[in-house]
Regions:
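Conserved AMP-binding/adenylate-forming core of the ANL superfamily
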Residues: 32, 56-110, 127-134, 186, ...
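Conserved pre-ATP/AMP-binding loop-to-beta segment of ANL
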Residues: 52-55, 176-197, 203-204, 228-235
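Conserved AMP-binding A3 loop
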Residues: 66-71, 193-220
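Conserved ATP-dependent adenylate/AMP-binding module captured primarily in the ANL superfamily
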Residues: 121, 125-150, 155-160, 176-177, ...
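Conserved AMP-binding/adenylation subdomain of ANL enzymes
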Residues: 216-235, 243-311
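Gly/Ser/Thr-rich phosphate-binding loop
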Residues: 258, 278, 287-290, 300-372, ...
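Conserved ATP-binding/catalytic segment of the ANL
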Residues: 393-448, 563-564
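Conserved C-terminal "lid"/linker of ANL adenylate-forming enzymes
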Residues: 446, 472-477, 506-565
Length: 565
């Protein structure tokens, strides 16, 4: 018996396909991209007029919520913009925010955007978790900021000793003058909204230029995939950090673009903090809910055991959306089952794919699929180029949502685009009728001594899924060797004995998919050494490089090596 699915208006999935003689494939939507504004503040002004009392931002304040309406946000953005103009900030001297998501951060962002001053949200990990502040110093050397904001000077004291620009910890909101209107009038499609940082395999920060055109065009692309936003303004309860494009562009943008409400969730998907998220979701019913796979996994025990939480969470929900990493199949299946048991119908569990350089949405799967690796197809306005690489396809992209390049790094910018102007994403896919299946990062893949290619991304995802919840993460080794090995970061409650007991059951279909040996890594991944990104994801190449001696031990007769029969 087929199950009913909650009725939600979703976009089309048809795609035009062109195949060239050189083996490359081009994909694009047959539907035209809808009109979009020159600057996102036009949407803020629209909603301040159309729904002035609607909540734009809310942040918990004890048992209540501190709120900012659309009318208040516009008024305060203009005042903040006046202050930033008085500080003589510019693209050469931008605003940086070192602390995380809060209402003050949001208003600084809006104020800077209103008067055309670029801002850069910096990962708090570079200030609070780092011990050498190397990435923070590198970012400041690249950007040369004119002003920095922190939510708490005491908490950020050590980091502030590393920087030289002016620092504020409270908003300054003078009365706006005609200078604000003049600056706003000069803002156009090519004006830089923000610099978002991403790290390559070297771990060196790159400042991705994000323009008004990129952000506005991408929001119209998202609306083409998820047109229900135009029928009902979205309500979000969101913890994801604004220094990442997923929340800072995708989520924040879809709220501003469509007149929604953004409830800032100060929880995180980790012990001791997930409870804050649960408390918020008991009170606020989202209509669109985004999380990373570990976030959904952390929520599951609470959704299983708390009927009141389940009822509120699923009551108004139109779409569940995951991104940022591979979603374990069991998490996908159980979230769908809980939704059905709670409200008698399935809720669309959708996903997409993008990058900091693409503002971010480049693919969207807005139809049901059993394979969680299916990232969907391009929305209107996006053109994809799929280039054969071994037995997968390297994806490249062109469209108004693509960055013009990396700030003050012309060599990296030139390397990022091919001869036809397509941005090189560096990700591997397979193209099937149901959509594009993500296979991992091409830079991580390697050959065994037999010449057989190992696709690391897919193998890592299968390994983590098979060994859940024992394994926190894994690094795949074996380049130039005869067999594949695994360097394992165990979860806090697991041990090597449990891992050994389950190694023999890991499924394989050949030498490139078979883990022949494994070793447990006792030292956690290092942020300062570039082994771990601020998102908590593992940099495969950095771990292999820094722990070369352990790679050698993995391929020795050491007693610590776990052999897979």
């Amino acid at each position: 018996m087929s199950r009913s699915t909650r009725s939600v208006r979703l976009g089309p999935r048809d795609t035009l396909v062109e195949r060239r003689r050189d083996g490359s494939t081009f994909l694009r939507s047959p539907h035209a991209l809808g009109p979009y504004p020159q600057k996102l503040t036009q949407r803020l002004e629209h909603w301040a007029g159309a729904a002035p009392e609607r909540v734009l931002f809310a942040q918990r304040n004890g048992d209540a919520w501190r709120t900012v309406t659309y009318a208040q946000a516009l008024e305060r953005a203009r005042s903040v913009g006046q202050y930033l103009l008085q500080k003589k900030l510019s693209a050469e001297r931008p605003l940086v925010v070192l602390s995380g998501n809060d209402i003050e951060h949001a208003l600084l962002h809006l104020g800077a955007m209103y008067v055309g001053i670029p801002y850069a949200p910096i990962s708090p990990a570079y200030s609070l978790l780092s011990t050498d502040f190397g990435k923070l110093r590198a970012i400041f050397e690249l950007l040369t900021p004119g002003l920095a904001f922190v939510s708490d000077r005491k908490v950020f004291a050590k980091a502030l000793n590393q920087i030289t620009c002016d620092v504020i910890d409270k908003l300054e909101e003078p009365k706006p003058t005609s200078a604000v209107d003049e600056a706003h009038a000069r803002v156009g499609a090519d004006t830089i909204v923000k610099f978002l940082f991403t790290s390559g395999s070297t771990g060196t920060p790159k400042a991705v230029v994000n323009t008004q055109r990129m952000w506005c065009a991408n929001q119209e692309m998202i609306l083409g995939m998820l047109p229900f936003f135009a029928q009902e303004p979205p309500v979000l309860v969101d913890w994801a950090p604004w220094h990442h494009t997923a929340a800072g562009n995708h989520d924040l943008g879809l709220v501003l673009y469509n007149g929604g409400s953004y409830y800032i969730d100060e929880g995180k998907p980790m012990p001791g903090m997930i409870e804050t998220t649960v408390r918020n979701l008991r009170e606020i019913a989202p209509t669109w809910y985004f999380n990373v796979p570990k976030g959904f996994e952390a929520l599951l025990p609470y959704l299983r055991s708390d009927a009141a939480l389940r009822t509120n969470f699923f009551s108004k929900l139109q779409v569940l959306w995951f991104a940022g990493a591979a979603l374990p199949q069991h998490v996908f299946d159980e979230m769908k089952e809980l939704a059905y048991r709670t409200c008698g119908e399935e809720i669309p569990f959708l996903t997409g794919f993008g990058a900091t350089e693409t503002a971010p949405a480049t693919l969207g799967r807005v139809w049901p699929a059993q394979n969680v690796a299916n990232m969907g197809l391009p929305p209107p306005g996006v053109e994809l180029k799929l280039v054969p690489f071994q037995n997968v396809l390297e994806m490249r992209v062109k469209g108004p949502h693509v960055t013009p390049g990396y700030w003050r790094q012309p060599e990296l910018t030139a390397q990022a685009f091919d001869e036809e102007g397509f941005y090189r994403l560096g990700d591997a896919f397979l193209f099937e009728e149901e959509g594009l299946l993500f296979k991992g990062r091409i830079a991580e893949d390697f050959k065994l001594s037999t010449g057989t290619w190992v696709h690391v991304g897919a193998l890592r995802a299968r390994f983590i899924e098979h060994f859940a919840p024992l394994v926190r993460d894994v690094v795949i080794a074996g380049e130039g060797r005869s067999e594949v090995g695994a360097m394992v970061f165990l979860s806090a409650t697991a041990d090597a004995v449990e891992l050994r007991a389950r190694l023999a059951s890991f499924p394989s279909t050949g030498s490139s998919n078979r883990i022949a040996r494994a070793i447990v890594l006792e030292e956690p991944p290092s942020l300062d050494a570039g082994e771990m990104t601020d998102k908590g994801s593992i940099n495969q190449r950095a771990v292999l490089r820094r722990r070369a001696a352990l790679v050698e031990e993995l391929y020795s007769e050491s007693q610590r090596v776990l052999r897979c029969q």
